[in-house]
Amino acid sequence: MAAAPPLRDRLSFLHRLPILLKGTSDDDVPCPGYLFEEIAKISHESPGSSQCLLEYLLSRLHSSSGHGKLKVLKILLYLCSHGSSFFLLILKRNSAFIQEAAAFAGPPDPLHGNSLYQKVRAAAQDLGSTLFSDTVLPLAPSQPLGTPPATGMGSQARPHSTLQGFGYSKEHGRTAVRHQPGQAGGGWDELDSGPSSQNSSQNSDLSRVSDSGSHSGSDSHSGASREPGDLAERVEVVALSDCQQELSLVRTVTRGPRAFLSREEAQHFIKACGLLNCEAVLQLLTCHLRGTSECTQLRALCAIASLGSSDLLPQEHILLRTRPWLQELSMGSPGPVTNKATKILRHFEASCGQLSPARGTSAEPGPTAALPGPSDLLTDAVPLPGSQVFLQPLSSTPVSSRSPAPSSGMPSSPVPTPPPDASPIPAPGDPSEAEARLAESRRWRPERIPGGTDSPKRGPSSCAWSRDSLFAGMELVACPRLVGAGAAAGESCPDAPRAPQTSSQRTAAKEPPGSEPSAFAFLNA
C-alpha cells in the first residue's frame, strides 16, 4: 500500500468504526442498505480515510467467515461505482485479496452444502470483472458532506433539473439494436420491449458467473441428484488446461510409494473432490489408465473405486465413462491391474444392473445339464468310503414296519418283502433307474390300518373303511368301566387269544357293519 495515513485521519476513522463493524458482521443477517451510503461517504472524506477504509475491508475479507467475506465483497462492489477515485486506485493495487476470495472453499455445510462458497466465489469474480473492465466506471466527483446524493424512484442528482419523478427521466444517447436469435418477432431487441428482453443481458452475465463457479467447484449433492442419462447427454467438454486444481489432485493421488490408496488418502481424495469438478477428476483418472506404470494404474483404479463408493457422481455415469478402459485392462495379461480392473467393472455392473458382453453371451447348457428329477436330492448323494451312512436314498430300501412289537397273544400280519433285484444303493447319475425304483418301492410300501398293524396296500374293496374318516387311525383312551367289561368278556371265552382292544374296536364290533365308527362312542356307554 501507499504511505501510512496521518493520525488525524485515523482518529476520524475510529468514529466510523461502529458502522463498519455492523456492516461486516460474521452472521447471515444482510447488510442494511443505508450502510452502503455511509461507507461510501467515508471514502470521499480524504485520501487517508479511503486508505484506512480499504485496510479495514481487506483485513475483514482475509480473516472473516464466509458470511463476512460475502458482505465485504458486496460493499467493495458498491464502492466501485459510488466510491472515490483514490479508493479505486489503491483497490486495484491490492487485487490479490480478491483473487484469494475467488478460490474460497471449505468443508460443505450439513444443511446448505457448498452454496455459501459458491456465492463468495461468484461475488469475487463479479468484483474483479467490474474493477478491471475496459469500460470507464461512472465516477462522480467528490461531493461535499452537506449535500447528500438524491435517492428515490426517478430522482436525478442534476443541479438544473426542473421536473423530477417517475416518467421525467431524461433519455440518454441512442442504443444500438442487437439481434437476438431467440426473440420472437424477427429476433430484434427493441427499446420499448418488455422486461424479458431487458433482462436478457443481465441473465447472460449471471450465466457467465454461474458457469465459472461450476467449473471452479461443484456441489456434491447437486451432482449426485442428476439423472445418468441427462449427464451423459449434457456433459460439457472440460478443457484440461482450465482444471489446474483437479490436475494437481489427480497427480497427488496417482503418485505414491504404495500401489494402493490408504484409508486416509481415500478420505482426503473424496473430500477434495467435493470441492472441485468431479467429472474433470474422473476424466483425468481415466487418462492415467493407459500408458503409465503399474503402480500408477493401480492407484488410479483405487481412486475410481473410491469415487464410485461416494455420492458425488452416479455409478451409472462412472460406468459409462470408464467401461472402455476397464474392459481393455481386464482383457490384458493376468496381473494385479487386470484383477483390479475386472473387480471394479463387475462391481459397477452389479450395482447398475447391467451385464458386460462377455458375461451376457454365455454358452447354452447341453443336454447333460437337464434339470434333476425329484429323486436326485438323495440318490445323487454317495457317501465317502469308510464313513457311516446316516441318510440313504429313497429308493434304496422300502419303508420298514414301525409298529411296536406285538404281544404274546397278538398275531402279527405278514409284511411283504421287496423283490430280490432291489439294490440298497443305486448307481449315482442314473435318474431313470432311480425313478423306476422309487415307483416300485412306493408300490410295495405298507400302510397302517385301523387295527394297529401294518399290511400291504390293498384295493378299496378289501379295506375296512372305504371312506377316509377324520379320526381314522386314532386310538382313544378307554374308560375304566369299559376296560373292566372287556376283562369279564375275556374270562368268559378262555379259549380265545387275549389281545388288548381299544374302545373304538369294541364299539365297531357292537355296531352294525354298515354304520360308520364314531370317535365319541365311549360317551354313550
Curated annotation (Swiss-Prot):
Its main location: Golgi. The gene is TEPSIN. Residues 8-141 form the ENTH domain. Keywords: Cytoplasm, Cytoplasmic vesicle, Golgi apparatus, Membrane, Phosphoprotein. This is AP-4 complex accessory subunit Tepsin. Changing V477A: No effect on interaction with AP4B1 in vitro. Changing M474Q: Loss of interaction with AP4B1 in vitro. Residues 139-229, 355-465, 487-525 are annotated as: Disordered. It is a peripheral membrane protein. Changing E475A: No effect on interaction with AP4B1 in vitro. Residues 467-477 are annotated as: Interaction with AP4B1. It is found in: Golgi apparatus, trans-Golgi network membrane; Cytoplasmic vesicle; Cytoplasm, Cytosol. Residues 413-429 have a biased composition (Pro residues). Residues 193-225, 393-412 have a biased composition (Low complexity). The modification Phosphoserine is found at S333, S356. It comes from the Eukaryota. Associates with the adapter-like complex 4 (AP-4) and may therefore play a role in vesicular trafficking of proteins at the trans-Golgi network. GO terms for cellular component: coated vesicle membrane; cytoplasm; cytosol; intracellular membrane-bounded organelle; organelle membrane; trans-Golgi network membrane. It holds the Pfam family ENTH. Residues 515-525 are annotated as: Interaction with AP4E1.
